[in-house]
């Protein structure tokens, strides 16, 4: 049984390929730069957005399932149209081809940004009304709609969207990578003012969720939400990274009000709101179908920093 995986060279995709191989699946990689990664059985060119339909259909020959995790993210030079083309239109074209040619399931890896902005505070589940606040979130929501519509129009119900909170692991980018760099500082940090709490998930746990959704015996639901068992405070995340770097906590009890005023003054008010927002994902639906949320979030973050520190020391 063969699974087509897009985005397989990314830090999440690599874990998915590894988990699929360990479970006995053959893996076909679709990539814009078709170089065979470890443990892939074959590699094909990922067609461009304007490629003919036959190019997308050809990718699906011999494929049972499709896992689409390729995406445009954290690209400050990209326009709204760029995000929409890659995360929306291309996703829709893949889904239409898979609905026509692949016999199994289609999983689209999405993000909680498809439903809430970075400054949203509250609980998030599958029923959360989508209100994306940035180009990335709007494009991921568009990809969700196109995926489910493609399968619905083909009379099929074996496609699902898997929404993810921030994902950690080797090669991560975005806010978690920024926090890890910030934690690797000898200076005291005003973490007492960073009152936000976040649900996180590891790349390995994402891969385990993908494997479960591909193999579970019952039909797919259209939307799933993943996340670790326990959310982590921003201050705990930074402390875990510092522990991994071998640095003392060195937290400074700066009140939140002056920090908020300074952030607003320098045009960083939205970023400050994100650091103080609480976003808690409820993965109970996915857990009820056999996936097990991880419980050692902070230990994994510390180990991630420890490995980064070790590599940096060896490179010196």
In which residue ranges do the predicted regions lie?
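Catalytic helix-loop patch of NAD(P)-dependent Rossmann-fold dehydrogenases
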Residues: 85, 120-167
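N-terminal Rossmann NAD(P)H-binding glycine-rich loop of SDR-like oxidoreductase domains
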Residues: 3-23
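Short alpha-helix in the Rossmann-fold core of NAD(P)-dependent oxidoreductases
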Residues: 84-91, 107, 139-140, 199
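Conserved C-terminal active-site "lid" loop/helix of NAD(P)H-dependent oxidoreductases
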Residues: 203, 239, 261-293, 303
């Amino acid at each position: 049984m063969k699974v087509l995986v897009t985005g397989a060279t990314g830090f999440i995709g690599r874990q998915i390929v590894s988990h699929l191989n360990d479970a006995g699946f053959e893996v076909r990689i679709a990539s814009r730069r078709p170089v065979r990664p470890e443990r892939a059985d074959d590699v094909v060119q990922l067609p461009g957005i304007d490629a003919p339909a036959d190019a997308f259909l050809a990718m699906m020959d011999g494929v049972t399932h499709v896992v689409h995790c390729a995406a445009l993210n954290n690209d400050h030079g990209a326009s709204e149209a760029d995000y929409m083309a890659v995360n929306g239109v291309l996703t829709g074209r893949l889904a239409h081809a898979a609905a026509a040619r692949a016999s199994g399931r289609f999983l689209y890896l999405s993000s909680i940004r498809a439903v809430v902005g970075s400054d949203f505070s509250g609980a998030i589940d599958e029923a959360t009304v989508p209100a994306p606040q940035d180009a990335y979130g709007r494009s991921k929501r568009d990809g969700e709609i196109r995926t489910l519509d493609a399968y619905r129009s083909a009379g099929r119900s074996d496609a699902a969207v898997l929404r993810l909170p921030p994902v950690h692991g080797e090669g991560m980018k975005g806010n978690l990578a920024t926090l890890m760099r910030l934690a690797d500082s000898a200076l005291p940090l005003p973490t007492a003012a960073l009152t936000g709490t976040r649900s996180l998930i590891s790349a390995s746990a994402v891969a385990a969720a993908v494997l479960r959704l591909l193999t579970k015996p019952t039909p797919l639901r259209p939307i799933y939400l993943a996340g670790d068992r326990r959310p982590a405070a921003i201050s705990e995340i930074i402390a875990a990274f510092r522990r991994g770097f071998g640095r003392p906590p060195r937290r400074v009890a700066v009140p939140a009000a002056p920090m908020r005023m300074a952030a607003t003054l320098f045009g960083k008010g939205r970023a400050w709101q994100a650091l103080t927002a609480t976003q808690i994902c409820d993965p109970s639906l996915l857990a009820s179908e056999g996936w097990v949320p991880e419980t050692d979030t902070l230990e994994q973050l510390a180990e991630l920093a420890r490995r980064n520190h070790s590599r940096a020391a060896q490179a010196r």
